């Protein structure tokens, strides 16, 4: 507890917190997924069968030499115009995140207890209504959670689309 009789000190503390408060949230409930193999930089071989559609809460499987690509499109709604935008993503393992084709960062899952957890990607700010974000995650098995499973003999592991 802060022990100060000065009201302006508390008011200043509140002002410092306000920019970090989430005021609006836009859930991305459905993602397209396709699987394949990363061969070399910008060279991929995709599995036959096309894309699958996954929703938050669904599980997906990956293993050695497998790469999964998740994609979704978001259009900034009017009520988010002028605000700071962030993506909060937790798909299970680790993933490289591209926005409109450009690498913006990487995320790693909270489900891998003991390993680094990163789930925030900063977008261009301030947001402008109508702006389109094409989001793509390139997820592979190089995550700590899979290493633990592989050491125990697993060839594949299941992850969950937790947050988007």
Regions found by a protein language model. Name each.
Residues 47, 55-57, 77, 88-90, ...:
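A structural detector for beta-sheet-dominated domains
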Residues 2-33, 135-164:
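An acidic-aromatic loop/edge-strand motif
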Residues 96-152:
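Beta-strand-rich ligand-recognition modules
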Residues 67-73, 84-86, 132-134:
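Intrinsic-disorder/low-complexity, polar/charged segments enriched in Ser/Thr/Lys/Arg/Asp/Glu/Gln
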Residues 57, 65, 128-132:
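Glycine-centered loop/turn motifs
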């Amino acid at each position: 507890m802060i022990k100060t009789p000065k009201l302006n000190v508390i008011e200043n503390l509140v002002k410092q917190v306000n920019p970090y408060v989430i005021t609006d949230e836009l859930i991305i409930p459905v993602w397209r997924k396709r699987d394949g193999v990363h061969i070399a930089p910008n060279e991929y071989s995709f599995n036959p069968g096309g894309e699958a559609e996954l929703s938050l809460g669904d599980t997906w499987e990956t293993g050695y030499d497998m790469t999964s690509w998740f994609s979704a499109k978001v259009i900034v709604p009017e009520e988010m115009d002028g605000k700071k935008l962030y993506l909060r993503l937790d798909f299970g393992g680790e993933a490289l995140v591209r926005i409109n084709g450009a690498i913006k960062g990487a995320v790693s899952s909270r489900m891998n207890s003991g390993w680094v957890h990163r789930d925030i990607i900063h977008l261009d700010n301030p947001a402008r209504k109508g702006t389109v974000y094409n989001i793509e995650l390139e997820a592979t098995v190089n995550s700590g959670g899979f290493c633990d499973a592989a050491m125990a003999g697993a060839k594949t592991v299941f992850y969950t689309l937790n947050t988007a």
